[in-house]
């Protein structure tokens, strides 16, 4: 898939006049169109809903855009629930999936009448004790072992290892949990599972759906409860590399439909609503980190230093993740220079790219780092006293809007109990 920026150099320079680099910028048009594609792909299911993972991009402007497109939200903490509430989400618009859940978080989810997804069998009594048992309840499934998509030309395709994951229940634990929940007043039950991350395959969701649909049939027979919802969670990925193929959401939706009709309909369970939580797929490609080249260094390697660092985009440092880079204004120039593109943290893993072939980069060039619309700004941090960058929305009409200002030193010091001692630093 060819990686094309949604900003031109001229557009970036216009934004920079108002918002200095570094900043994350999001494409409203792209996000809206993608949300509509998702809804269309699963329109065959009357109860379908996409629950956008708030952790991927926790900005109220983005959440409100997705709400307008018919999406709900997937929350995992008290603050995500609070953010979603002020954006107008409540009740069945919220999926609450948490683990090792604090009392305050569970109480808030119950107060909002969210769909609560229990991660562990012991959470049944915990939920009843701290909040109460709602009519609608989910349990998270962990099948153990290794999850794969079978054989390919490259060999056995291992996608992930659920058996090593801390999440979810065994089938036996789920069955006992549903029985207990039913006895305590729950009436409608859901199944949730997340078995692999960032899959670049149209087969992942259909394969997962087949597993969960068969599980639903077994659980309903074993317990007599009504399985009304199945949440395929996230895991549908995006092509971070240009040589990767983009997932076809229409093909994915059709694959899930076929499994639905093969397994659930014959079992008399054709009323089951399908939910998804595609945070990365929904917004990932429609965000970018825009930075300026401020230094170059020539020692054993060639380095380009940016005014952004891993505090603005953690994924390359934390996971060794690849993010494509475009030098705005030089899209058509030959990539004949090898660089390490780095930030200024006192950590040697603060590298956006290693041995990357790029056009010649000059001081002052605008560097566009692709695919930061999910798990980008959201994973920002303050190590080394670095400050989180601004967030900008590129509106559908071509204008831009600041939707989160950059942090300031005052923000950094705000929670310290000696702030009065810092007052002279902030006086004009």
Regions inferred by a protein language model and the residue ranges of each:
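A charged N-terminal "starter" segment
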Residues: 1-115, 121-135, 183-187, 221, ...
């Amino acid at each position: 898939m060819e990686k094309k920026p949604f900003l031109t150099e001229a557009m970036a320079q216009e934004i920079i006049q108002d918002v200095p680099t570094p900043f994350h910028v999001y494409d409203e048009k792209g996000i809206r169109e993608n949300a509509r594609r998702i809804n269309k792909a699963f329109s065959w299911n009357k109860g379908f809903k996409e629950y956008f993972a708030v952790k991927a991009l926790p900005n109220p402007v983005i959440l409100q855009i997705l709400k307008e497109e018919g999406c709900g939200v997937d929350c995992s903490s008290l603050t995500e629930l609070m953010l979603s509430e002020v954006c107008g989400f409540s009740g069945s618009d919220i999926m609450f999936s948490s683990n090792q859940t604090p009392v305050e978080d569970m109480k808030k989810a119950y107060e909002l009448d969210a769909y609560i997804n229990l991660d562990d069998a012991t959470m049944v009594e915990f939920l009843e004790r701290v909040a109460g048992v709602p009519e609608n309840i989910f349990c998270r499934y962990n099948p153990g072992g290794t999850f794969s998509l079978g054989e390919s030309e490259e060999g056995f395709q291992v996608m992930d290892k659920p058996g090593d994951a801390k999440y979810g229940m065994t089938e036996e634990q789920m069955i006992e949990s549903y029985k207990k929940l039913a006895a305590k007043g729950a009436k409608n039950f859901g199944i949730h599972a997340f078995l692999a991350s960032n899959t670049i395959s149209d087969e992942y969701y259909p394969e997962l759906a087949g597993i969960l649909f068969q599980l639903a049939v077994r659980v309903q027979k074993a317990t007599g409860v009504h399985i009304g919802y199945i949440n395929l969670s996230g895991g549908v990925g995006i092509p971070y590399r240009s040589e990767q193929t983009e997932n076809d959401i229409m093909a994915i939706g059709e694959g899930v439909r076929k499994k639905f009709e093969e397994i659930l309909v014959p079992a008399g369970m054709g009323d089951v609503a399908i939910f998804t939580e595609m945070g990365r797929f929904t917004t990932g490609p429609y965000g970018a980190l825009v930075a300026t080249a401020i230094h170059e260094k020539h020692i054993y390697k060639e380095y380009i230093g940016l005014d952004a660092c891993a505090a603005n985009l953690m994924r390359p440092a934390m996971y060794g993740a690849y993010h494509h880079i475009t030098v705005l204004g030089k899209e058509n120039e030959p990539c004949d220079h090898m660089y390490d593109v780095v930030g200024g943290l006192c950590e040697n893993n603060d590298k956006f790219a290693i041995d990357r072939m790029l056009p010649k980069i000059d001081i002052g060039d605008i560097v566009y780092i692709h695919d930061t619309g999910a798990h980008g700004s959201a994973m920002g941090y303050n190590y080394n006293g670095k400050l989180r960058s601004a967030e900008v929305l590129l509106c559908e009409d071509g204008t831009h809007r600041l939707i989160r200002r950059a942090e300031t030193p005052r923000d950094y010091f705000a929670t310290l109990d000696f702030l009065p001692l810092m007052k002279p630093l902030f006086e004009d």
